[in-house]
Amino acid sequence: MPKQKVAILGPGSWGTALAQVLNDNGHEVRLWGNIPEQINEINTNHTNSHYFKDIVLDEAIKATLDLKEALADADAILFVVPTKVTRLVAKQVAQVLDHKAVVMHASKGLEPGTHERLSTILEEEISAQLRSEIVVVSGPSHAEETIVRDITLITAASKDITAAKYVQALFSNHYFRLYTNTDVIGVETAGALKNIIAVGAGALHGLGYGDNAKAAVITRGLAEITRLGVKLGADPLTYSGLSGVGDLIVTGTSVHSRNWRAGAALGRGEKLKDIESNMGMVIEGISTTKVAYEIAQELGVYMPITSAIYKSIYEGADIKESILGMMSNEFRSENEWHS
């Protein structure tokens, strides 16, 4: 692929790791953020120490506080900002972007209030500047592993297969490989909802339960993710792929996962506000739990794990009692994933 200019909006851990992937592939990368100290550190020291203490970035990776500068002549734009500010940043992009570009996002969440997927938000806010359909970049991927060039396989999903293949070629190399998919609903819901299950798996660990319990919550969590996704129009097969079960495994079993760590802390009895303060990073699973619970209630979808996590976080229920309460739920067939 010829050299491309890519603007990455959000110099967090994942945005920085993806910047390195693109730089390794010979593309021109510009990171945009709004914290002067961080931007200066990336440009001066070639580090992003808040996320990666021992990683030195290539000097070719540049960062800026100026959104217009970041977007100038960009062939592709990658959103990697927290879900809650995606619409705000998209509005800002729409005001300064003066040409059409391929727009991607690599965030995982659902917008509070509207319940919208992130691709829908981007379509609504910057439709005039889209060169193609939105492309979703999602899958089992710890930034801590990608940044050291560990093998990573994820998904590029778009209703426009040509756009998905463009992004596949843009990112893929000897350690980072993308597979295409046209089921945007499935890929986005899988990426968002697995964070809830990761909180649950972490909570089990914090409470002292073993691998049997963790395997159960991950497996039954996949069932309820699939139930809701299919109700929203997804292909159930998507949930058996990289962006589904793959992402659920990596997020629901690893200390690298901030959602898992948050759940573990909740299980140990720590307060949510203290957990968020100590992490210093967005825990998407917390807000996604509320959105998913509201959607499930509205559509009548059975999501017992999501409900248990919701009641613990938002209604003050004891997390151990909420989880153990599921053991007395009505008997069901394992094959009732769709009901």
Curated annotation (Swiss-Prot):
CC terms in the record's Gene Ontology section = cytosol
Query: Per UniProt, what is one Pfam family of this protein?
Result: NAD_Gly3P_dh_C
- Kindly state a single biological-process term from the GO annotations of this entry: glycerol-3-phosphate biosynthetic process
Q: What is its EC number?
A: 1.1.1.94
Q: Where is this protein found?
A: Cytoplasm
Keywords assigned by UniProt?
A: Cytoplasm, Lipid biosynthesis, Lipid metabolism, NAD, NADP, Nucleotide-binding, Oxidoreductase, Phospholipid biosynthesis, Phospholipid metabolism
Q: Which reaction does it catalyse?
A: sn-glycerol 3-phosphate + NAD(+) = dihydroxyacetone phosphate + NADH + H(+); sn-glycerol 3-phosphate + NADP(+) = dihydroxyacetone phosphate + NADPH + H(+)
Where are its TM segments located?
Answer: none
Please provide, alphabetically and separated by semicolons, the GO molecular function terms listed in this UniProt record. Answer: glycerol-3-phosphate dehydrogenase [NAD(P)+] activity; NAD binding
Active site at 194 (proton acceptor)
**Matches recorded under InterPro entries:** 6-PGluconate_DH-like_C_sf, 6PGD_dom2, G3P_DH_NAD-dep, G3P_DH_NAD-dep_C, G3P_DH_NAD-dep_N, NAD(P)-bd_dom_sf
Give the binding site residues for sn-glycerol 3-phosphate: 108, 139, 141, 194, 247, 257-259
Query: Could you tell me which Gene3D superfamilies the record lists for this protein?
Result: N-(1-d-carboxylethyl)-l-norvaline Dehydrogenase, domain 2, NAD(P)-binding Rossmann-like Domain
Record: residues binding NADPH: 13-14, 108, 143, 258, 282, 284
- What pathway does the UniProt record associate with this protein? Membrane lipid metabolism; glycerophospholipid metabolism
Q: What is this enzyme's class at the first EC digit?
A: oxidoreductase
Q: Report the domain of life of the source organism.
A: Bacteria
Give the family per the record.
Belongs to the NAD-dependent glycerol-3-phosphate dehydrogenase family.
Described by its record, this protein's role is as follows: Catalyzes the reduction of the glycolytic intermediate dihydroxyacetone phosphate (DHAP) to sn-glycerol 3-phosphate (G3P), the key precursor for phospholipid synthesis.
Name of the protein in question: Glycerol-3-phosphate dehydrogenase [NAD(P)+]
